[in-house]
Every structure is written in structure tokens, then in C-alpha cells.
């Protein structure tokens, strides 16, 4: 196969150097292997939570599902590196649906997938009971909520929503293979091209984005990547300026780096490792405000929680995002929910409008199990941590009006 394919390639493959790591073992942090828990215990926990929703007034249907993965990966290369790694991850989602003369509305839990074991389903790790208790009233309020008036609003975006905006507008945009055109015929390229490294004003001076393989319970946390590179942490955006990319050993030289930062991944032995996202996160402001103070600082705005649908162009530049909950803010106080909300911007305008970054108390690690990339397609789990943040006068669309209904 290699000999047959060789005439099609015009670039010589050369890997940047990496120290040898012989016979290394790494295991992610978790308490309870989900595969050690009986199916009946799993079903009972989900049934207990979903039945509480069904018992509430205004909830006509409830669904609950959980996914859990134990990944065991062994790597060896001809330079002498050999690693054995194991990591565990969990994702649980519970939905409440209301059906009536209004049509239907839904709302789901805000719990994020993460590198936990079955302990993730305990209330001392994530307060499931409290969220389930609040969900029916929030759903009823959403059903009765007015449709948003389109225009420009200050947006207070919760990390349960902002993680996805980071993923689409920063995570994918700063994949170096995408920036140099390797993904052009599948999922697009990037506006953040290599000629802009060190000069592109990605966002406001409050914006500090890092890539890492170290975050506790991160879905992209590993000891070594799939080219035998040890985990690292590095700056991607510093004080609002693009300063780094996600690299593997094959493409690092394109930005004059003599070492990869450990972003190679293959989702199975049948696939070649390609550059994939590490944990890509927005740093909180160490002295930043808590959530109540952020709400109090807004005269006219919307507080957005939870992710739903999104759209972004093939250069990771023009986008729009919706969410699960949209709370009106008037004169520093929450003033009921809205619906049919989407926010729309370009990547640099949006991040350039970030005027407040929340403190550590607002920080949440979000993410997804199912980031796709490559041909043949590969799936990777990814995490994005961030605090709540306030964005100045962002364009808000009414999704029903935009659909012509």
C-alpha cells in the first residue's frame, strides 16, 4: 500500500524529535470503573431521576441515557518509546419535554461529559437531585416565555454554553493542519492562518486560551499522545493575540517548532494518527467576579445556559449558536425567560467584545464525546473549560422569524 501510494505524495514525511519514553504507564483519575457497576444499578439510577421529572406537573415525557467508555491503548515505535494508557469517561443526559397547545418544548440537564467513572452519578460529585428538582419549573417558564425581540444585547454566557463556542471558533480554528489547508475538502480550513501567528487580534486583551493534556478529568487528558509525545500545556491565545497552534510531529515544522505539543490521536488501530484537539480552555480571571456580581453588572442583557444547535462556516469565522435556557436580565436582575434565541457574530468580533471574564467560582469543564475530523472520519472526545463571560452588544436573532414562520 505504501509503495502504491508513494507517487501521489509530493511532500516528504519528517517527524520532529521527541525523547524516548520506554515502558511508561498512565491511568486517568477516576474512582469507580463504570463497567464494574451492574446494569440494574445503572438503570435504577436513571429511572429514579427520570421518574421524578415525569411526576412533575407540565412534564409529558422524560428520557435519560448514559454513555461510558474505558479506553485502553498501547503504543510502541521504532525509536524505543512504548506506552500503555487507560482512561475512563462518562456522559449522562436527562431531558424533560412538554407537549400541549404550544406545540412542544424541551429542556435538558446541564451536566457535562467528563473523565469520571460511575462516581459521576453520585450527588456529592454532581448534584443531580437538585437539577432534576428545578428542571420542571424552568421548562414551564420556557413554555410560557415570550419570543425574543431581535437586536443587540449584552450576553452573559454560562460555561455550559460557551464551551461549544470555544470548540467551534477556537478549537477547530487553531488546528494547524486545518490552518494549512489539510481539511479543506471535508470540514473546511481556518481564518487563523500561519501568516497571522503572533499578530492576529483574536479577541479582547482579557482572552487567554491554553491547550493542555493535564486537566483533571479532561476528555483530552492523556499522559502521551499517539506519536509518543509527552503531555504538555501551552498558550494558543495570549492577551487576545494568536500565539500558538495544536501540533503533531509531522506538521510542527510548518510553524518552525522543533517539538510537537502532543496533539496526535487515532480512534482505533485501523486509523492513522492525525492532529486532534487537546483540552482547549479559556482561563478564568483570578480576581474576576462571581455569577451574581456578573448579573448585577448588566442593565440590558440575556443570560444563556446549555448548548443546543449551532452553525459555523468553513473558515471557522461566521457563526451562530442557540442554547437551552435564555434568561432576560434587566437592571441587574433576572427577569424571566425568553425563547427562540440565537446569537450571531464573526469569531474575532465576538471574542473582541468580551468585556468581563468570570472568576474561578464560575469555571466549568465542558465538552463532548463526538468531535469528528479526517477522512476516513475519526471520532475524539474533547474538553473545554471556561468561566462565565460577558460579551458586549452581540447580535441576537429570533430563530422563528429567521425560519420565516
Region locations from a protein language model:
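Dual-mode signal for accessory low-complexity, basic/Gly-rich regions
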Residues: 173, 184-405
Amino acid at each position: 500500500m505504501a509503495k502504491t501510494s508513494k507517487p501521489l505524495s509530493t511532500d516528504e514525511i519528517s517527524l520532529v524529535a521527541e525523547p524516548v519514553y520506554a515502558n511508561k504507564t498512565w491511568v486517568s483519575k477516576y474512582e469507580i470503573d463504570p463497567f464494574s457497576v451492574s446494569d440494574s444499578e445503572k438503570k435504577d439510577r436513571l429511572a429514579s431521576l427520570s421518574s421524578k421529572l415525569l411526576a412533575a406537573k407540565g412534564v409529558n415525557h422524560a428520557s435519560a441515557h448514559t454513555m461510558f467508555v474505558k479506553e485502553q491503548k498501547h503504543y510502541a515505535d521504532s525509536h524505543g518509546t512504548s506506552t500503555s494508557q487507560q482512561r475512563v469517561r462518562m456522559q449522562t443526559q436527562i431531558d424533560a419535554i412538554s407537549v400541549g397547545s404550544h406545540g412542544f418544548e424541551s429542556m435538558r440537564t446541564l451536566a457535562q461529559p467528563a473523565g469520571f467513572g460511575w462516581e459521576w452519578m453520585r450527588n456529592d460529585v454532581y448534584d443531580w437531585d437538585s437539577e432534576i428538582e428545578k428542571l420542571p419549573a424552568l421548562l414551564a417558564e420556557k413554555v410560557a416565555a415570550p419570543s425574543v425581540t431581535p437586536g443587540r444585547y449584552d450576553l452573559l454566557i454560562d460555561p455550559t454554553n460557551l464551551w461549544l463556542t470555544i470548540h467551534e471558533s477556537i478549537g477547530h480554528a487553531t488546528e494547524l493542519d486545518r490552518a494549512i489547508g489539510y481539511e479543506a475538502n471535508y470540514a473546511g480550513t481556518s481564518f487563523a492562518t500561519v501568516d497571522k501567528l503572533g499578530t492576529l487580534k483574536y479577541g479582547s486583551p482579557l482572552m487567554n486560551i491554553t491547550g493542555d493534556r493535564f486537566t483533571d478529568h479532561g476528555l483530552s487528558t492523556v499522559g502521551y499522545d499517539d506519536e509518543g509525545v509527552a503531555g504538555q500545556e501551552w498558550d494558543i491565545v495570549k492577551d487576545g493575540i494568536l500565539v500558538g497552534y495544536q501540533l503533531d510531529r509531522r506538521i510542527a515544522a510548518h510553524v518552525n517548532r522543533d517539538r510537537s505539543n502532543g496533539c496526535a490521536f487515532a480512534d482505533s488501530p485501523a486509523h492513522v494518527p492525525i492532529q486532534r484537539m487537546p483540552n482547549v480552555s479559556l482561563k478564568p480571571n483570578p480576581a474576576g467576579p462571581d455569577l451574581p456580581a456578573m448579573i448585577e453588572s448588566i442593565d440590558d442583557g440575556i443570560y444563556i445556559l446549555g448548548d443546543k444547535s449551532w452553525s459555523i462556516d468553513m473558515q471557522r469565522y461566521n457563526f451562530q449558536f442557540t442554547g437551552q435556557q435564555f434568561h432576560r436580565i434587566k437592571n441587574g436582575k433576572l427577569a424571566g425567560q425568553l425563547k427562540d434565541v440565537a446569537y450571531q457574530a464573526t469569531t474575532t468580533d465576538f471574542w473582541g467584545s468580551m468585556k468581563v471574564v468570570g472568576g474561578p467560582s464560575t469555571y466549568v469543564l465542558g465538552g463532548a464525546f463526538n468531535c469528528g475530523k479526517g477522512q476516513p472520519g475519526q471520532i475524539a472526545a474533547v474538553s473545554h473549560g471556561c468561566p462565565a463571560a460577558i460579551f458586549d452588544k452581540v447580535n441576537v436573532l429570533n430563530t422563528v422569524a429567521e425560519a420565516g414562520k
